[in-house]
């Protein structure tokens, strides 16, 4: 059926992009010019996660034109897109990014711990470094035959859910935290959250290793619900795909951070232009481009209200900070013996 093939085509290609690093040069030319002089071109290397590429294809030319007008200098961008976790490891292993825009604050914190980003990076930019927002969406098979609308529907007998293992997938961590917080952020206790999340994961026959495998399972009809990012589904619809999904009214704010990689900007002599680019990402002009491809703007002030209209209202929108922050959440939820392990133990006991 054409609709089913189209849906599979988009979702599988999106998952593949998240698993594969693709490097694109915005313009030709070899690096080693400093951002200090207005005559020579300067190159900036941006490393980001896959689903942001469509936005940066619009944002980068706007910034380049603005920089040229202000300084008289041409700026060229080398861009690398892939899964946030793999991009993080690549930078730590030697991919010399001037700017990183990743899916998790904890990913940037890993780069900081490797000594490449100076502590306090969140405080050196607006909005604590967060440039995009999104929420968890519940993708259903065509027509939503199981009537999935909210987190509680995931506990129904006979509902088959596919999500990745949060120990190996950053996106799956958001899914787990979204389900957990739907209890604790509405007055429930940790014990109640443990039971509720366990009931959900009892309906997850097999934990996929990553987003690609999760999507493969769903598109083959082996699951009723796929947990995914809202922005990816909006982008799919913009491309003409038919995707059925629901947005739980109690949801987690999936925040995308950005940071300058101090070690490499100093090495390349690109600090001034890199910092200017990061600042540009918080402007209404850049925020509008993120909104156009499905992200909820982190700073909606000044963004055309028509771009904000399609986003369903979230009744209770909580953040990782509400759960204690990544420094606490990572070990308590996903470390050895953490809440996820407790859920798995309870599921195994069935």
UniProtKB/Swiss-Prot annotation:
GO terms for cellular component: periplasmic space. This protein specifically binds sulfate and is involved in its transmembrane transport. One of its GO terms (molecular function) is sulfur compound binding. The lineage of its organism: Bacteria, Bacillati, Cyanobacteriota, Cyanophyceae, Synechococcales. It comes from the Bacteria. Residues 1-40 form the signal peptide. Belongs to the prokaryotic sulfate-binding protein family. Pfam families: SBP_bac_11. Its main location: periplasm. It comes from Synechococcus elongatus (strain ATCC 33912 / PCC 7942 / FACHB-805). This is Sulfate-binding protein. Keywords: Periplasm, Signal, Stress response, Sulfate transport, Transport.
